Amino acid sequence: MNIRPLHDRVIVKRKEVESKSAGGIVLTGSAAGKSTRGEVLAVGHGRILENGEVKPLDVKVGDIVIFNDGYGVKAEKIDNEEVLIMSESDILAIVEA
């Protein structure tokens, strides 16, 4: 995939949601829901501050993140693969192993 986000934008590939309930029941369709976890595929250079400095992003390529799947998140199909384009501020947490 050849894409470079600008400024504080991040490209994320949504992780598949767990398809079984805690009781072992297989969930399908909308019952499984959409995951709000994903892997960071690309990051912009950083957020431009009021004084003109560029603040590097906290997330990096390969991070697994939890994100807010709301208004500011844009889904795009690139190379037949759906990715999400979001601002770093849409990312709520980095999952650490």
Curated annotation (Swiss-Prot):
Molecular function terms from GO: ATP binding; metal ion binding; protein folding chaperone; protein-folding chaperone binding; unfolded protein binding
Keyword Chaperone on entry: yes
Subcellular location: Cytoplasm
Role description: Together with the chaperonin GroEL, plays an essential role in assisting protein folding. The GroEL-GroES system forms a nano-cage that allows encapsulation of the non-native substrate proteins and provides a physical environment optimized to promote and accelerate protein folding. GroES binds to the apical surface of the GroEL ring, thereby capping the opening of the GroEL channel.
Family matches, as PANTHER family: 10 KDA HEAT SHOCK PROTEIN (PTHR10772), CO-CHAPERONIN GROES (PTHR10772:SF58)
Oligomeric and partner information: Heptamer of 7 subunits arranged in a ring. Interacts with the chaperonin GroEL.
UniProt name for this protein: Co-chaperonin GroES
